[in-house]
From Swiss-Prot:
Domain of life where this protein originates: Eukaryota
Cofactor(s) for this UniProt protein: Cu cation
Assembly mode: Component of the cytochrome c oxidase (complex IV, CIV), a multisubunit enzyme composed of 14 subunits. The complex is composed of a catalytic core of 3 subunits MT-CO1, MT-CO2 and MT-CO3, encoded in the mitochondrial DNA, and 11 supernumerary subunits COX4I, COX5A, COX5B, COX6A, COX6B, COX6C, COX7A, COX7B, COX7C, COX8 and NDUFA4, which are encoded in the nuclear genome.
Gene3D superfamilies with a match to the protein in the record: 1.10.287.90, Cupredoxins - blue copper proteins (2.60.40.420)
GO biological process, one term: ATP synthesis coupled electron transport
Protein name according to UniProt: Cytochrome c oxidase subunit 2
InterPro entries: CcO_II, CcO_II-like_C, CcO_II_C, Copper_CuA, Cupredoxin, Cyt_c_oxidase_su2, Cyt_c_oxidase_su2_TM_dom, Cyt_c_oxidase_su2_TM_sf
Residues recorded with modification Phosphotyrosine: 218
GO MF terms held by the record: copper ion binding; cytochrome-c oxidase activity
Function: Component of the cytochrome c oxidase, the last enzyme in the mitochondrial electron transport chain which drives oxidative phosphorylation. The respiratory chain contains 3 multisubunit complexes succinate dehydrogenase (complex II, CII), ubiquinol-cytochrome c oxidoreductase (cytochrome b-c1 complex, complex III, CIII) and cytochrome c oxidase (complex IV, CIV), that cooperate to transfer electrons derived from NADH and succinate to molecular oxygen, creating an electrochemical gradient over the inner membrane that drives transmembrane transport and the ATP synthase.
Annotated S-S bridges: none
Reaction catalysis annotation: 4 Fe(II)-[cytochrome c] + O2 + 8 H(+)(in) = 4 Fe(III)-[cytochrome c] + 2 H2O + 4 H(+)(out)
Amino acid sequence: MAYPLQLGFQDATSPVMEELLHFHDHTLMIIFLISSLVLYIIMLMLTTKLIHTNMMNVQEMEMIWTILPAIILILIALPSLHTLYMMDEINNPLLTIKTMGHQWFWSYEYTDYEDLAFDSYMITTDSLKFGELRLLEVDNRMVLPTDLPVRVLVSSEDVLHSWAVPSLGLKTDAIPGRLNQVTLTSMRPGLFYGQCSEICGANHSFMPIVLELVPLKYFESWSASLA
């Protein structure tokens, strides 16, 4: 989860988020090199006493500033496409969960079970226990198994919402009348927090998301106790 005054991303919890972090660092390095080169050229132009007044057509230079940006764009596009296709890839998910956005709570339905569904509301500040996080805790957490592919179907009952969990690299729009899907695989157990990331009304900031990732045997015990 995020901490006050934190710089950078949250720790990656899924392979997708790791790829996103690598792509971010890769792109940031390219931007840094380009910015350094441009700054160097500007400083050189401002400090040099040499002036070229008869340079009207230099074909070699035109080829360089045409080919070099094309190469840079390819270096950015290739890893970007790899990550994009990785995010959309869904192979034999162990579990499918239908997530519906409402004003202003989430409802979860485990479609592989007959009667495993519940609503998830934010816990108000005056009901928090010691150690719980303000505006981030819910009464019913979404419990999932670790190290296994899970498919999440996202939609909305009323207005636009967005189901987002930053540490897993997830952000999927919840659109009324449309079903979007996303896959997640957690590499470690724990609690992972998110929030609705699409302005959806007066209580938009009171729609937290809490994922509790547990080993498979604990997930089976939890699902058996509720089903």
